[in-house]
């Protein structure tokens, strides 16, 4: 921990917390800091110009990152009949109905995302207290409650990330790994920003994208000049 602390301190000394870095420079700094023994994630925090306390200004959605997330995702699907077969063909690891619900109640949750066909919500709805706190509860706003379960599975496997604004009005998301090429990280960040723009509440006034900062898992935040994103 001492070595990590010293490395973090050395990196922090290189970063001007008040400066807005061009995206290429910001990514170079963040990747330089990502020297842990594991492939650190590259995360983004976006401060939105919304009032998170107002229900009509809750920003939530999902986006498929063009370059993926660098993470292998296991998918569980609530579906029956033909839709169940389609989910399996698309790559879902676990597919079921009441049997899947019983597995979840027993604590057997070896998956990262849950998708549900609308006609199964009578079953899924009973699992809210288990799935909700874990961020696994299917929701139509992020595309995990859908009649097209096959596409939802493919999107999850392809690198879909979900986002939801927190109480402070900030969106947190992962846009890849430290091992990614800068071009891949830029592409993923642009896709996320575009999705956030599309999710802008009609009642949001003033500047919507207020601040954007990048960091690695063990690193410090580097603020990004939004003008450099538009120039990509």
Curated annotation (Swiss-Prot):
One GO term (biological process): regulation of translation
Record bears the keyword tRNA-binding: yes
CDD domains in the record: Ribosomal_L1
Keyword tRNA-binding part of the UniProt annotation: yes
Sorted UniProt keywords: Repressor, Ribonucleoprotein, Ribosomal protein, RNA-binding, rRNA-binding, Translation regulation, tRNA-binding
Molecular function in Gene Ontology: rRNA binding; structural constituent of ribosome; tRNA binding
Gene Ontology, cellular component aspect: cytosolic large ribosomal subunit
Disulfide bonds listed in the record: none
InterPro entries, alphabetized: Ribosom_uL1_bac-type, Ribosomal_uL1, Ribosomal_uL1-like, Ribosomal_uL1/biogenesis, Ribosomal_uL1_3-a/b-sand, Ribosomal_uL1_CS
PANTHER family in UniProt: 54S RIBOSOMAL PROTEIN L1, MITOCHONDRIAL, LARGE RIBOSOMAL SUBUNIT PROTEIN UL1M
Quaternary structure and partners: Part of the 50S ribosomal subunit.
NCBIfam families: rplA_bact (TIGR01169)
Similarity section: Belongs to the universal ribosomal protein uL1 family.
Role played: Binds directly to 23S rRNA. The L1 stalk is quite mobile in the ribosome, and is involved in E site tRNA release. Protein L1 is also a translational repressor protein, it controls the translation of the L11 operon by binding to its mRNA.
The protein, known as: Large ribosomal subunit protein uL1
Organism whose genome encodes this protein: Burkholderia mallei (strain ATCC 23344)
Name of the gene: rplA
């Amino acid at each position: 921990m001492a070595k990590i602390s010293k490395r973090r301190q050395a990196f922090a000394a290189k970063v001007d917390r008040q400066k807005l870095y061009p995206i290429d420079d910001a990514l170079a700094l963040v990747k330089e800091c990502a020297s842990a023994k594991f492939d650190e994630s590259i995360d983004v925090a976006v401060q939105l110009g919304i009032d998170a306390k107002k229900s009509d200004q809750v920003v939530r959605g999902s986006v498929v990152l063009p370059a993926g997330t660098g993470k292998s995702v296991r998918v569980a699907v609530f579906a029956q009949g033909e839709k169940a077969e389609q989910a399996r063909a698309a790559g879902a690891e676990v597919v079921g109905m009441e049997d899947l619900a019983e597995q979840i109640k027993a604590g057997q949750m070896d998956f990262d995302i849950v998708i549900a066909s609308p006609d199964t919500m009578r079953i899924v709805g009973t699992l809210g207290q288990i799935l909700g706190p874990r961020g696994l509860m299917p929701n139509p706003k992020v595309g995990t409650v859908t009649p097209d379960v096959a596409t939802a599975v493919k999107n999850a496997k392809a690198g879909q990330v979900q986002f939801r604004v927190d109480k402070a009005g900030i969106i947190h998301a992962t846009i890849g790994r430290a091992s990614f090429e800068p071009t891949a990280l830029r592409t993923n960040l642009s896709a996320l920003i575009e999705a956030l723009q599309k999710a802008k509440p009609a009642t949001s006034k003033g500047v919507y994208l207020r601040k954007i900062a990048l960091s690695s898992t063990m690193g410090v935040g580097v603020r990004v000049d939004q003008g450099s994103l538009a120039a990509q």
